[in-house]
UniProtKB/Swiss-Prot annotation:
Protein name according to UniProt: Large ribosomal subunit protein bL36
UniProt family annotation: Belongs to the bacterial ribosomal protein bL36 family.
Disulfide bridge partners, by residue number: none
Keyword vocabulary terms for this entry: Ribonucleoprotein, Ribosomal protein
Gene: rpmJ
Keyword Ribosomal protein: yes
Listed GO CC annotations: ribonucleoprotein complex; ribosome
Organism: Phytoplasma mali (strain AT)
Length: 38
């Protein structure tokens, strides 16, 4: 999970999720794309 100031979708499989005021990008197929904002 990378922590970034700005998160972007890197592939069509990425899903944007908001949890507890934080933005996450989750990808089940390619877990290296997982990101968190903040």
């Amino acid at each position: 999970m990378k922590v970034r100031s700005s998160v972007k979708k890197r592939s069509p499989d990425d899903i944007i999720v908001r949890r507890k005021g934080r933005v996450y990008i989750i990808n089940k197929k390619n877990r290296r794309h997982n990101q968190r904002q903040g």
